[in-house]
Amino acid sequence: MAAAAASRGIGAKLGLREIRIHLCQRSPGSQGVRDFIEKRYVELKKANPDLPILIRECSDVQPKLWARYAFGQEKNVPLNNFSADQVTRALENVLSGKA
């Protein structure tokens, strides 16, 4: 069902199946990612209700954006020391196939 929905929404032409965001709850390098989640996650999820968007918190992990596509292909973008706006641009690039 999520795969069918992803085929109609963002990243549809690329076969996007899932977005994962890894971050640390406390590190300064993850602050922009935490800000992004607080300010923009709800809007992103409302616009894409059937696309799995997973948030994974882990102590001392480097913040990273993962996108999983059809046939198990994955791309990742490091988000260390990014601002919330830079995280937004990184997500847009992944969704458009530029990353």
Curated annotation (Swiss-Prot):
It is a peripheral membrane protein. GO terms for cellular component: mitochondrial inner membrane; respiratory chain complex I. The modification N6-succinyllysine is found at K64. It is found in: Mitochondrion inner membrane. Keywords: Acetylation, Disulfide bond, Electron transport, Membrane, Mitochondrion, Mitochondrion inner membrane, Respiratory chain, Transport. The keyword GTP-binding does not apply. Disulfide bonds join C24-C58. Belongs to the complex I NDUFA2 subunit family. Complex I is composed of 45 different subunits. This is NADH dehydrogenase [ubiquinone] 1 alpha subcomplex subunit 2. The gene is NDUFA2.
